[in-house]
């Protein structure tokens, strides 16, 4: 029961919008590590506007790598180990690093149709099928066009691996044409046998919300957001242990608990 409560709390936090401070923080974070962030917008064939991040190496080796985040997540997840984060390691090795944000996460929440707002049912009527059919080809092709690379290396994490497997099955010709190497981190092909009970419960809650016309779940007021952010900032260890406990994770000692408020705020739910 405690695990479910904490998980619901984290899900609630994951629906927050970006404040001005957060919009500048993640850019300042990367620049402080020596790599200014370039944000690119790409339009999918069905009208979604996606954000693709680009970091340029100081000594290029001519190779291009694309990183794709997991479920309820964003490209920001790849930076949670600070200077030892995967993008920074790749940059120091000379790789041209690109990171995609799929539809529905906090960086890719716009649509070409101004009437199709995020709170409207139509915006959220998507699944991994649309990510495979529209998002990945659009983002990968943009990277290829901007870099001139015929093929790039794809690194996926969690759902980022799932949608790549689906891409290979759905459009093998494109995968063969665009990808030269594939790296799978935290591989997931389904969650049918998950040992995390809240997933099934939350799925049922989502169905109920959709039936009654609620399309943006568990948003917080500014007062609630400020309270939680202040608590996590002053007690990062407690927040970190709560996450470890809720997800049954054995603490590794590598996570920067001081960054937890930002990582939680920059996450989003998946479909």
Language-model region placement:
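Cleavable N-terminal signal peptides of Sec/SRP-targeted secreted and luminal proteins
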Residues: 2-19, 115
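N-terminal cap/lid segment of alpha/beta-hydrolase-fold proteins
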Residues: 25-57
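Short, surface-exposed "cap/lid" segments of acyl-processing enzymes
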Residues: 44, 56-113
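Conserved alpha/beta-hydrolase "nucleophile elbow" surrounding the catalytic nucleophile
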Residues: 69-71, 152-161
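Residue in the alpha/beta-hydrolase core beta-strand immediately N-terminal to the catalytic nucleophile
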Residues: 101, 130, 153-158, 181-183
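Alpha/beta-hydrolase active-site loop
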Residues: 121-145
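Alpha/beta-hydrolase-fold enzymes
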Residues: 145-150, 162-271
